[in-house]
């Protein structure tokens, strides 16, 4: 859309009038002409036709009264007399001599101008170039009214220490000559080059010559010649990567020649600078691919140098103002924007008026030999290390009437650099409070790399995520919301490719090999830094102690300058900025890190701006750059001295050529990264991660130590088997966690370390209470604190070595006691295991028998006792094991008639039990050791019991094999109750009952269990529905009978624990549906091939009278005494419940009735017993033990019932005294 002359002049004059109106309204001298709205110039402006589509002016309340045009500048000057002086007024600064810039006019870049009207105010130049003799000077004929009035065209730089003070203050840093340079010079002219191309001109060209680059395309320069746009050519732009028009400041008092070029973006994007210079469609990738050119080039073609990158033109044409816009919203948006700009221009004017008389010290002027009237170009005085301080009320405009989208970043080489310097300074930034001073922080470091050669060779570039070859910036890396989440609508601009970044993915400028570098600029004592002001009171500050060589990692923000030394190898250094997106946290981020040195009033973000060494071969890439804000302002102040170098000295760099240079630099940089990594300051997240790793390592070490002290090795000795194996002794917690991994089929060799720390022996009190004992003698710390006796067991060395006699655990091969499916490395699977001074190393191969061979078991010399720890916890050899099982069946079977002898011995000979369940073998051995004639075997009774007890503690809800596990539990309960370990027997009783319930054995003979989903038809469909078992168990008659006998023995054990102690019964009859077992003689004659029992089982019912009737109706000639024992225990359970109940009192009627009923049931049971069940002489030898057992239990029932009934009665009536019944029952037990 072309721009006509009336529309252009209208916008230009409107902006000029408003700016002057704001400045003069805030000046100390108020003229009456400001209130007069009926001047000649105002009337003339009202005659100008309004823009089409402009229906009405919408002004905010704060700007009411500003919608009317103001008189022209000339008419206002002619009619307004100079103000009278007042004592409190400040004089305005004198107007310096103006210079008229020559406009580069080319046929292709002609601008539509009006033949009847020409600009009345010439183009302005920056104060630093007013006295520059290089450009022709054209005297400006100002009206006479200008002589008494003083206007400053640019905002002077105030002292960085006094942000809130009107008077200049002394800067606290110890710098001899403190100088605050002026802003860059601004040359406004019309050119054929687009705004984006012109704004990308840089002073960091490698050659510093005026010849155009060979890779510049002239066709590209004139591609958009038909579009009229504003071109700002700066005398010197200090940009490192691609700093653009964000560095230009437009004077609020020289807008007469300004041509506004509003784009199609929204007003918010313009005001807040959320737009790249290339236009609304320019993305970060497009902006990063631009290469700044040499601003000193005579032709603007050098400004499009891409350094060999044949990239397409990224800037889009910027449409100019159309006096007749088709969109009515454009005019309203432009008015809103103009109002905002005028408001900030007023603020800038006030700021300028406050600091109008700041001047450099005379000593500094004399030292630098600069006349007071001479404006020094700040670009020539700046060094590569500056600091940026957010200045209040200092908004700047860019070339397309929007606020700058990036802060000016200037880098000049430091002429004081020493060649081959090895200083390293780490560049760190932080979120810190706005008021936090610089000297409160530490830890800045930056690398100094030796690079280059005499001809200034290029460094190889490494592809990154933001390079054109790799696809550019996408996804989360370009999400500016993570960097500046408090800016509204920022995510929308990111999606549209409009992100306010200036350093995101810019290419570094390196010196060309064909163009030698020129001499450097004179040194300056002050240093600078770059600041990006963010919303919410934060600012992003970049601080560079020195200049480093450019890094060609495209994933970082490379800020570089050409080397200025002509021939010398002054290897510079440049820090690389790696920007990482960090999510905003609810807590204050700046409180986490406070190690970065910052200047007063500077806020930095350590997480978002990280400095890493240049030329690093690391592949981390992040192209998200910190967003900018129109609040960003550039201020120069003395640099903070960097910390001393921390890196070790390296041999001098030897320049090479070609691929050798690349490889040498990568290796060298990698080595420096490794050596310098420890010196880098870690953040709160790194500290937390290190703490977590340390905790994990400590936990693993503790587990490993615990493993060494908690593994036991078990195994039987079998001289007939060449294989050997081990079983690891574990705690229940360890086995439950790792039981699925166990498989001793592939156990490996056991080895013991050369030195194992001797375990302290805990006292009996601490071991019983499961407390940690310090093993102090004669009294440990806990016993001393509790005031109890402290006793220690006698060491095993004093008891002698029990591993004698027939047992030879180490000389003979061993058979493996295994649990099925066990295959584990003890170090990994048993971190909670309890060792006996062993370090296990399972490395042996399997033997021919399918069991792992035990190749080496060495004992530590520091073992707590002299006996072999492995032999103490091994099963006996095969012969001894068969002997022990035979002793059990010969002497103890009548107490545990739940084993089918022939089937059990067959499995023992075949080794099936050794494979499936060593628990039952340990239990049998500990009981059979009581009747063994060998004293050495009897001494091992406790050891076998402890191992069986420990093995059962490892079982879970559904153990395998279920039958052998429950049988072993019965044996353990019996041994524990007779050996004095009542606590274990009581706990084991409850556990085994719950395991039986979980396996469904308690309802194996039920016909109806509706609550469990079992119906009568399920009985005929198969036992798996009744048992609820996943395994094929109880399929033949022998297994079924073993299950029945095992469950009835469990009920017997439960009643034996309940009636003497008064504890409740663990097995309720209501959930017990198992038929009475058949005669033992018939049971032992059964074979596994038989599917049905030779005799039917008597069903069990809860009604005791019905149960006695069922027993009397049996016509089997073989007397089944065990059936009567089971019925007697059912009766004993009922008596125990009535006597030990907590509900009824002794003198209540209900209690007396229950006792009378139980007494009658005892009498009925005695009368129903056959003669062979009551007389030992008439009973068969196999049943004599059961006869004695039955008589003892019947007398126990009578004694318990009668004693409770008569203990409170008077002994006077001996005839009716029931106490005699209790005494008689006790006498009968004694006689038996």
From Swiss-Prot:
Principal subcellular localisation of the protein: nucleus
Matches recorded under Pfam families: Fungal_trans (PF04082), Zn_clus (PF00172)
Gene Ontology cellular-component annotations: nucleus
Amino acid composition bias (Basic and acidic residues), ranges on this chain: 384-399, 474-484
SUPFAM superfamilies: Zn2/Cys6 DNA-binding domain (SSF57701)
UniProt biased composition (Low complexity): 194-212, 508-523, 616-626
Region (Disordered): 33-94, 182-330, 355-402, 438-484, 502-525, 572-682
SMART domains: Fungal_trans, GAL4
One example GO MF annotation: DNA-binding transcription factor activity, RNA polymerase II-specific
Listed Pro residues bias regions: 80-94, 639-654
CDD domains: fungal_TF_MHR, GAL4
Keyword list, A-Z: DNA-binding, Metal-binding, Nucleus, Transcription, Transcription regulation, Zinc
DNA-binding region(s), residue ranges: 763-790
GO annotation terms (biological process): DNA-templated transcription
Subcellular location: Nucleus
Biased composition (Polar residues): 224-254, 285-305, 585-595
Domain of life: Eukaryota
Protein's job: Transcription factor that likely regulates the expression of the gene cluster that mediates the biosynthesis of squalestatin S1 (SQS1, also known as zaragozic acid A), a lead compound for the treatment of hyper-cholesterolemia by targeting squalene synthase (SS).
Name of the protein in its database record: Squalestatin S1 biosynthesis transcriptional activator L3
Species: Phoma sp. (strain ATCC 20986 / MF5453)
Lineage, top ranks: Eukaryota, Fungi, Dikarya, Ascomycota, Pezizomycotina
């Amino acid at each position: 859309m072309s721009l006509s002359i009336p529309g252009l002049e209208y916008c230009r004059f409107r902006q000029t009038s408003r700016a002057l109106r704001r400045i003069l309204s805030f000046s100390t001298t108020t003229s009456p002409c400001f209130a007069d709205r009926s001047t000649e110039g105002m009337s003339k402006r009202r005659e100008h036709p309004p823009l089409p589509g402009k229906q009405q002016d919408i002004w905010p309340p704060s700007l009411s009264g500003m919608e009317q045009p103001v008189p022209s500048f000339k008419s206002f000057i002619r009619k307004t007399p100079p103000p009278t002086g007042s004592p409190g007024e400040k004089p305005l600064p004198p107007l310096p001599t103006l210079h008229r810039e020559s406009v580069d006019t080319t046929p292709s870049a002609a601008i539509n101008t009006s033949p009847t009207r020409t600009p009345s105010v010439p183009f302005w130049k920056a104060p630093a170039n007013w006295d520059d003799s290089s450009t022709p000077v054209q005297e400006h004929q100002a009206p006479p009214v200008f002589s008494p009035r003083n206007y400053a065209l640019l905002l002077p730089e105030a002292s960085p220490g006094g942000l809130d003070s009107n008077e200049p203050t002394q800067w606290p840093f110890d710098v001899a000559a403190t100088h605050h340079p002026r802003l860059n010079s601004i040359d406004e002219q019309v050119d054929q080059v687009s705004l984006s191309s012109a704004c990308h001109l840089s002073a960091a060209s490698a050659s510093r010559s005026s010849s155009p680059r060979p890779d510049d395309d002239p066709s590209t320069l004139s591609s958009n010649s038909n579009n009229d746009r504003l071109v700002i050519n700066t005398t010197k732009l200090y940009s490192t990567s691609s700093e653009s028009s964000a560095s230009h400041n437009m004077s609020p008092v020289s807008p007469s020649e300004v041509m506004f070029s509003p784009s199609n973006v929204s007003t918010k994007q313009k005001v807040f600078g959320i737009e790249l210079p290339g236009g609304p469609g320019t993305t970060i990738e497009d902006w990063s691919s631009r290469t700044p050119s040499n601003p000193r080039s005579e032709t603007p073609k050098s400004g499009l140098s891409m350094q060999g990158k044949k990239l397409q033109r990224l800037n889009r044409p910027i449409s100019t103002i159309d006096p007749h816009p088709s969109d009515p919203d454009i005019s309203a948006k432009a008015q809103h924007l103009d109002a905002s700009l005028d408001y900030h221009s007023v603020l800038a004017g006030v700021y300028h008026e406050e600091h109008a008389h700041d001047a450099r010290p005379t000593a500094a002027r004399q030292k630098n030999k600069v006349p007071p009237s001479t404006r020094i170009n700040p670009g020539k005085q700046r060094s590569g290390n500056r600091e940026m301080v957010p200045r209040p009320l200092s908004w700047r405009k860019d070339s397309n009437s929007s606020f700058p989208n990036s802060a000016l970043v200037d880098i000049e080489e430091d002429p004081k650099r020493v060649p081959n310097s090895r200083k390293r300074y780490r560049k760190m930034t932080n979120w810190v409070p706005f008021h936090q001073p610089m000297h409160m922080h530490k830890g800045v470091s930056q690398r100094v790399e030796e690079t280059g050669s005499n001809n200034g060779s290029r460094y190889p570039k490494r592809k990154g995520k933001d390079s054109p070859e790799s696809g550019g910036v996408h996804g989360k890396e370009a999400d500016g919301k993570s960097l500046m989440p408090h800016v509204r609508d920022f995510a929308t601009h990111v999606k549209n490719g409009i992100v306010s970044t200036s350093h995101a993915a810019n290419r570094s400028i390196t010196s060309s090999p064909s163009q030698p570098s020129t001499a450097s600029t004179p040194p300056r004592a002050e240093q600078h830094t770059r600041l990006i002001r963010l919303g919410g009171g934060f600012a992003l500050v970049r601080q560079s102690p020195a200049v480093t060589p450019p890094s060609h990692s495209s994933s970082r923000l490379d800020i570089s300058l050409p080397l200025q030394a002509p021939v010398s190898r002054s290897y510079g250094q440049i820090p690389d900025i790696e920007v990482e997106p960090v999510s905003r946290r609810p807590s204050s981020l700046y409180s986490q890190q406070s190690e970065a040195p910052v200047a007063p009033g500077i806020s930095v973000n350590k997480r978002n701006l990280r400095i890493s060494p240049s030329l690093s071969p690391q592949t981390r890439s992040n192209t998200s750059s910190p967003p900018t804000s129109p609040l960003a302002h550039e201020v120069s102040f003395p640099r903070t001295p960097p910390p001393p170098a921390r890196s070790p000295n390296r041999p001098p760099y030897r320049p090479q050529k070609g691929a050798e240079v690349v490889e040498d630099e990568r290796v060298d940089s990698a080595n420096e990264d490794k050596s310098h990594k420890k010196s880098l300051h870690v953040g709160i997240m790194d500290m937390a991660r290190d703490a977590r790793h340390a905790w994990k390592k400590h936990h693993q070490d503790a587990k490993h130590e615990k493993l060494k002290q908690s593994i036991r090795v078990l195994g039987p000795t079998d001289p007939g088997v060449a294989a050997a194996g081990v079983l690891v002794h574990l705690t229940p917690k360890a086995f439950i966690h790792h039981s699925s991994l166990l498989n001793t089929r592939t156990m490996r060799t056991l080895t013991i370390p050369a030195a194992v720390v001797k375990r302290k022996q805990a006292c009996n009190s601490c071991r019983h209470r499961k407390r940690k004992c310090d093993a102090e003698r004669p009294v440990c710390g806990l016993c001393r604190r509790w005031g109890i006796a402290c006793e220690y067991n006698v060491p095993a060395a004093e008891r002698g070595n029990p591993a004698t006699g027939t047992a030879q655990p180490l000389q003979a091969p061993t058979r493996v006691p295994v649990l099925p499916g066990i295959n584990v490395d003890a170090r990994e699977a048993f971190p909670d295991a309890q060792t006996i001074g062993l370090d296990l190393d399972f490395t042996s191969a399997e033997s021919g028998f399918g069991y792992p061979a035990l190749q080496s078991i060495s004992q530590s010399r520091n073992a707590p006792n002299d006996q072999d720890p492995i032999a103490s916890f091994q099963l006996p050899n095969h012969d001894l094991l068969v002997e022990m099982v035979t002793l059990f069946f010969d002497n103890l079977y009548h107490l545990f008639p739940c084993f089918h002898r022939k089937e059990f011995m067959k499995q023992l000979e075949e080794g099936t039990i050794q494979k499936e369940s060593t628990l039952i073998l340990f239990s049998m051995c500990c009981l059979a050791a009581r009747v063994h004639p060998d004293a050495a075997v009897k001494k091992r009774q406790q050891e076998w019991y402890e191992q069986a007890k420990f093995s059962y503690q490892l079982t879970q809800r559904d153990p395998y094999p279920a039958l052998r596990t429950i049988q072993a539990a019965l044996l353990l309960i019996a041994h524990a109750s007779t050996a004095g370990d009542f606590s274990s027997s009581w706990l084991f009783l409850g556990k085994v009952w719950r395991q039986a319930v979980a396996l469904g054995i308690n309802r194996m003979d039920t016909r109806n269990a509706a609550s469990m989903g079992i119906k009568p038809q399920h009985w005929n469909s198969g036992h798996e529905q009744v048992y609820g078992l996943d395994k094929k168990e109880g399929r033949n008659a022998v297994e079924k009978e073993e299950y029945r006998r095992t469950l009835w023995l469990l009920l017997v054990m439960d009643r034996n624990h309940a009636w003497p102690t008064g504890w409740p019964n663990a097995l309720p009859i209501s959930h017990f549906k198992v038929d009475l077992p058949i005669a033992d003689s018939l049971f032992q004659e059964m074979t596994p091939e038989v599917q049905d029992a030779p005799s039917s089982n008597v069903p069990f019912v809860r009604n005791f009278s019905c149960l006695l009737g069922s027993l009397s109706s049996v016509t089997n000639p073989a007397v089944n005494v065990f059936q009567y024992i089971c019925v007697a225990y059912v009766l004993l359970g009922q008596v125990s419940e009535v006597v030990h109940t907590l509900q009824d009192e002794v003198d209540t009627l209900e209690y007396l009735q229950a006792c009378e009923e139980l007494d009658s049931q005892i009498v009925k049971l005695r009368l129903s017993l056959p003669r062979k069940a009551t007389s030992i002489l008439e009973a068969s030898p196999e049943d004599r033990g059961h006869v004695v057992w039955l008589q003892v239990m019947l007398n126990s029932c009578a004694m318990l019932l009668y004693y409770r009934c008569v203990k409170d009665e008077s002994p006077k009536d001996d005839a009716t005294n029931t106490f005699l019944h209790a005494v008689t029952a006790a006498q009968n037990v004694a006689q038996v």
